[in-house]
Structures are given as structure tokens and as C-alpha cells.
UniProtKB/Swiss-Prot annotation:
GO terms under biological process: adaptive immune response; immune response
Region (Complementarity-determining-2): 72-78
Region Complementarity-determining-1: start-end pairs: 46-56
GO terms assigned for molecular function: antigen binding
Framework-3: region residues: 79-110
Function according to Swiss-Prot or TrEMBL: V region of the variable domain of immunoglobulin light chains that participates in the antigen recognition. Immunoglobulins, also known as antibodies, are membrane-bound or secreted glycoproteins produced by B lymphocytes. In the recognition phase of humoral immunity, the membrane-bound immunoglobulins serve as receptors which, upon binding of a specific antigen, trigger the clonal expansion and differentiation of B lymphocytes into immunoglobulins-secreting plasma cells.
Assembly with partners or alone: Immunoglobulins are composed of two identical heavy chains and two identical light chains; disulfide-linked.
PANTHER family in UniProt: IMMUNOGLOBULIN LIGHT CHAIN
Name under which the protein is recorded: Immunoglobulin kappa variable 1-39
The UniProt record lists the keyword Secreted: yes
Length: 117
């Protein structure tokens, strides 16, 4: 039995498989918040479809490149203080800062790495 697949069909199949994972929308909340040193801060991120644990959190300060804090939803990047933690899987994720420090005042972003454009 000939099991060869025409190249065109294989190409279409690969496009379909890739397309099934694209166009994932990420919604972060709150969009802004007021907090004081010592506060416990929680930021949430929701994906429009399941992304398993393919979720990263970044911190960015003005004029600086984003800094990776958390990868794979809950793994702390080397050198990042333990007051930062991440949790969640599927569609709902949380970044928590257990006790806000002066150097933590920044912008925080979530990023899914389940699919790429």
C-alpha cells in the first residue's frame, strides 16, 4: 500500500494545524492599579483559548527592555526575587507580588508562547 502523501496535501494539513493555534487573544487585568510598598499585588491574565502552561510574565521599566520574571506559568527566572510568583494553566493565570518593593513599580505584561504568528 502506497503511504506517500502529496506535498500539496501535506502543506495544507500543516497550515490547518498551525492555524488552529493562532489568533489567541490575551486579556490582562487590571489595566492599571494603585499600590503601596508592602502590599500584596495580583495581576491576572486570561487567554481566549487554552494555552496549557505556555505563559510568561515580564516586567518593564521606562527606557529598559522587558525583563522575564516567570516562564511556563509558574517557573521563576533565575535571579528574580522570590516575592514574585506565577500560577494558573489553561486560560487563567496570575502573577503575584507578595510584598511590593520600591523597585517593583513598573509595567507588567503577560505573553503566551503557545503559538507564534
Amino acid at each position: 500500500m502506497d503511504m506517500r502523501v502529496p506535498a500539496q496535501l501535506l502543506g495544507l494539513l500543516l497550515l490547518w494545524l498551525r492555524g488552529a493555534r493562532c489568533d489567541i487573544q490575551m486579556t490582562q487585568s487590571p489595566s492599571s492599579l494603585s499600590a503601596s510598598v508592602g502590599d500584596r499585588v495580583t495581576i491576572t491574565c486570561r487567554a481566549s483559548q487554552s494555552i496549557s502552561s505556555y505563559l510568561n510574565w515580564y516586567q518593564q521599566k521606562p527606557g529598559k527592555a522587558p525583563k522575564l520574571l516567570i516562564y511556563a506559568a509558574s517557573s521563576l527566572q533565575s535571579g528574580v526575587p522570590s516575592r514574585f510568583s506565577g500560577s494558573g494553566s489553561g486560560t487563567d493565570f496570575t502573577l503575584t507580588i507578595s510584598s511590593l518593593q520600591p523597585e517593583d513599580f513598573a509595567t507588567y505584561y503577560c505573553q503566551q508562547s503557545y503559538s507564534t504568528p
